[in-house]
Design a protein with these regions (language model features):
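Phosphate-bearing ligand-interacting subdomains
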Residues: 1-32
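Short glycine-/acidic-enriched loop or helix-start segments at secondary-structure transitions
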Residues: 8-12, 129, 145
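Short, Lys/Arg-enriched, disordered terminal segments
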Residues: 18, 143-145
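Structural signal for interior beta-strand "rungs" in well-ordered beta-sheet cores
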Residues: 26-143
């Protein structure tokens, strides 16, 4: 899943899904998982070097966590998300499916990100993000497409 488009990843998986094909999680050995016993991973995830995953985190299927991503406690991430380098996701965050979080973006604690949301590079999300929208800036604001 090292493809930078959440939608393209979902289309590829849809076309090649087959009971005879396994999709392992690929986790770099430098990834720091705080509480292995209380983490749930789906399938087909790619977790790159120097990521940090705290306790009680749920990660769905076919997500890409690029270099240096940090995920806080009690967070849930759905399917087909692309999270770019050095993104910080605070504790208690809920992220839907097919989202793109730009380089060095930050999501504050207990926020919800819907589906098909794009969060711009270096943006600071301080409010919930609704489906099918683009948010940019500090603080991140809804941009009209």
């Amino acid at each position: 899943t090292a493809i930078g488009s959440p939608h393209v990843i979902s289309l590829i998986v849809e076309k090649i899904t087959n009971n005879k094909i396994l999709f392992p999680n690929i986790i770099d050995p430098t990834v720091d998982i705080l509480d292995v016993a209380n983490i749930r991973f789906g399938k087909g995830n790619v977790i790159c070097a120097k990521c940090f995953i705290s306790c009680r985190v749920e990660l769905g299927n076919f997500n890409l966590l690029n270099v240096g991503v940090a995920i806080g406690h009690d967070s849930t991430i759905g399917d087909f998300n692309v999270i770019m380098p050095n993104v910080n996701i605070s504790g208690g965050v809920s992220i839907g499916k097919e989202n793109m979080l730009g380089v060095k973006a930050t999501v504050l604690q207990y926020l919800k990100i819907g589906d098909n949301v794009k969060l711009g590079a270096n943006s600071l999300l301080m409010r919930n993000a609704k489906n099918d929208n683009l948010y940019i800036g500090i603080p991140a604001k809804l941009m009209r497409l």
